[in-house]
């Protein structure tokens, strides 16, 4: 895949913090913490591309690679379930139509923000573009609560995804990394030692005083 294609998973970082996303995807900086390592373990269990299960009218594909030229993104779906029915996509070597449902596995429990939902919606848009079909729903599976959460792929979510990736592509093409703005989310960020948001905040205050004291 073209190196200039953005990663689907990046939308999670972008929702959490635009600077974090830029540090990872533009400046190629990364630090692991306990949560990121645990998250990688959860996904390793899903990304076995050779494992395809067939259960009656259900086809289960793991680690499926997807992309969208419209959004300029690529990535992997943890799981895509194809259910045979009267609508969906035509699959090579399979009879009939198969309706795809993306399933994303997540650490912990449902988040307060919509980052997981937007990532799932992006996967759905990619699958639609690749398979020439329509996807109305997908699922988020959280390991802490051990159940799926159904997500409706609405027009509002689709528009939000389009707008966010347009902004991300703009930042990426310009090589723009937003300035640090310290807030409560910074405490649990794996990049806080690279970002140094508190130092950036102090520096901006010092700059303010320097500018305002010069004329005194």
Predicted segment positions?
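Cysteine-cluster motifs in flexible loop/terminal segments that predominantly coordinate metals
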Residues: 17, 177-216
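Nucleic-acid nuclease catalytic cores
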Residues: 75, 81-175, 187, 191-193
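Structural motif
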Residues: 4-12, 114-115, 177-184
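Metal-dependent nuclease catalytic cores that hydrolyze phosphodiester bonds in DNA/RNA
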Residues: 1-102, 202, 209-216
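Short, charged low-complexity intrinsically disordered segments located at boundaries
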Residues: 42-45, 52-56, 150-158, 190-202
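Residue-level signal for secondary-structure boundary elements
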Residues: 22-23, 34-35, 169, 173-180
């Amino acid at each position: 895949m073209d190196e200039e294609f953005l990663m689907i998973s990046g939308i999670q970082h972008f929702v959490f913090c635009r600077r974090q996303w830029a540090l990872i995807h533009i400046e190629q900086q990364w630090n692991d913490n306990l949560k990121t390592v645990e998250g990688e373990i959860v996904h390793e269990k899903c990304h076995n591309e050779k494992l395809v299960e067939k259960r009656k009218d259900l086809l289960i594909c793991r680690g499926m690679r997807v992309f969208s030229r419209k959004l300029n993104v690529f990535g992997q779906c943890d799981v895509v379930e194809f259910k045979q029915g009267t609508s969906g996509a035509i699959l090579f070597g399979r009879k009939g139509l198969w309706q795809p449902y993306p399933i994303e596995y997540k650490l912990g429990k449902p988040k307060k923000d919509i980052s997981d939902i937007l990532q799932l919606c992006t996967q759905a848009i990619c699958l639609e573009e690749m398979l020439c079909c329509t996807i109305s729903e997908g699922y988020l599976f959280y390991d802490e609560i051990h159940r799926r959460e159904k997500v409706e792929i609405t027009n509002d979510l689709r528009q939000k995804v389009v707008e966010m990736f347009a902004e991300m592509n703009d930042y990426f093409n310009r090589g723009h990394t937003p300035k640090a703005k310290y807030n409560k989310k910074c405490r649990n960020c794996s990049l806080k030692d690279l970002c140094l948001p508190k130092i950036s905040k102090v520096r901006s205050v010092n700059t303010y005083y320097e500018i305002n004291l010069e004329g005194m």
